[in-house]
Amino acid sequence: MNFKRMTDLDLAGKRVLIREDLNVPVKDGKVTSDARIRASLPTIEHALKAGAKVMLMSHLGRPTEGEYAEEFSLQPVADHLGGLLGRDVPLVKDWLGGVEVADGQVVLCENVRFNQGEKKDDEALSQKMAALCDIYVMDAFGTAHRAQASTHGVGKFAPVACAGPLLANELDALGKALDAPAKPLVAIVGGSKVSTKLEVLESLSDKVDQLVVGGGIANTFLAAAGHPVGKSLYEKDLIPAAQKIAEKVHIPIPVDVVTAKAFSESAEAATKKVEDVADDDMILDVGPQTAHIVAALMKEAKTIIWNGPVGVFEFDQFGEGTREMALAIADSDAFSIAGGGDTLAAVDKYGITDKVSYISTGGGAFLEFVEGKVLPAVAMLEARAKD
């Protein structure tokens, strides 16, 4: 992938418009989880140190487009960001007509979704945004799969369009894992439904040496292999698709599972062989034998792509499979990349954040990239790199 990088450009005295992903949870006017804000700090600090006039933009939540609503205001984000940077970060409400900002200073533009035409990638809106800056920086990987005015359109019209460090690092890591991976390449795909991950599974089946499936997805593969799944979550209509994938790539089917009679935090867990699953059982995790087999694969791997837990790890009695796998990834010498909301929660829960080579900040964008889809924001940056 060839794109301009913000870190290679002279930013001194330039009007730099940076699209970050600052879509964080807010409760009672306070940010409750600031991981995305912290992830954007190196980009912002680099631009400030370089003496740029820094304008930040982001969306927050899903307001009615074109209408101001206080509950979706970025004011709490501006306050929190100011605390982290140790400086005032003014929030600019009406910013499309122009923004006053001095060299080495930063402002945050109010929620991009308050502008009519943002989601439709409106050309007139994109041109207004582009007129604000000398350099446009796309740094929000989490929204790179959406062609919107602040993530895509503005980049077509800005004098210069480049990738910020967060986006560039993300693309470098994904490229390393998918374009020319060290082998063996092992992918773990968990989650509740095959239907939502079918394209990912099909795309990976052509690239990986081992494909580990977990969660409800594994139940469909178990059923496809002729095993009983009781009243577990699985998709009967996708059994043929699962069988087709299993013919193309090695999928270690669980040999033992952890079951319960009900889906609840207090449900009693029972470990049993796959052939012993009863009609009223729900499979909620892989068993210890299966976890050992998967852990051994992690040891052999040179590249690991992880998306989705292998069990209902939110309930501790059904979290052992995901825990053992997470620790095996942490101990592995492989280049490992983890992405997707539930995956990041598991990485966090088992304390392996600094043991995973790269943690992807994008959920949908991560999956679409793994599927081999073209991300509109990335395509735009590649096109602008030729200017």
From Swiss-Prot:
GO molecular function, one term: ATP binding
Binding site for substrate: D21, L22, N23, R36, H59, L60, G61, R62, R113, R146
Coiled-coil regions, chain positions: none
Reaction catalyzed: (2R)-3-phosphoglycerate + ATP = (2R)-3-phospho-glyceroyl phosphate + ADP
Lineage: Bacteria, Pseudomonadati, Pseudomonadota, Gammaproteobacteria, Oceanospirillales
Gene Ontology process terms (BP): gluconeogenesis; glycolytic process
GO cellular component, one term: cytosol
Designated name of the protein: Phosphoglycerate kinase
InterPro entries membership: Phosphoglycerate_kinase, Phosphoglycerate_kinase_CS, Phosphoglycerate_kinase_N, Phosphoglycerate_kinase_sf
Family: Belongs to the phosphoglycerate kinase family.
Annotated residues for binding of ATP: K197, E314, G340, G341, D342, T343
UniProt KW Kinase keyword: yes
Pathway(s) annotated for this protein in UniProt: Carbohydrate degradation; glycolysis; pyruvate from D-glyceraldehyde 3-phosphate: step 2/5
Protein keywords: ATP-binding, Cytoplasm, Glycolysis, Kinase, Nucleotide-binding, Transferase
Native source organism of the sequence: Alcanivorax borkumensis (strain ATCC 700651 / DSM 11573 / NCIMB 13689 / SK2)
